[in-house]
Amino acid sequence: MTRINVKIKAGQETELNGAGPNIPESAMQQLETQLDALNENDILILAGSIPGSLPQDTYEHLLARLQGKGVRAVVDATRDLLVNVLQYHPFLVKPNNHELGEIVGKTLQTDEEIVAAARTLQQKGARNVLVSMAGDGALLVDEQGQVHRIGCPKGKVVNSVGAG
């Protein structure tokens, strides 16, 4: 199962992303069987978009299936995919600052605004919120309420593909 994505670097970056794979029901059943074998403190990472052949509530379905097992879920997805899983109390969610702004309905310009928006996600169920901010580094609001901020090394960006 593959897809072809084309990234064009010519003054500005352009992405042409192909359609995701067609996932048969048997493959989803196999995945669910494998997930059933996860135990307490295992980590499950759900990242990216959901292929068009699957229901858009697939992440919710998978986390509901694991509820009560102590599996630590990490979710890196956009808008509704992320918001809809908060009820399952994921261990970590990782929006970027623009995605976080879309979720809370405002442009986030300062660290204080980003922290407040991250805490909104925590109030909705996220345990830890890691916000990536491109060249400005990242900010983590942990489940104890502590804020951790880290910059990133300065340098010349050659290609940002895969850097999110």
Where are the language model's segments positioned?
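Short, acidic/turn-prone active-site loops that include or flank metal/cofactor-
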Residues: 1, 20-22, 79, 97-100, ...
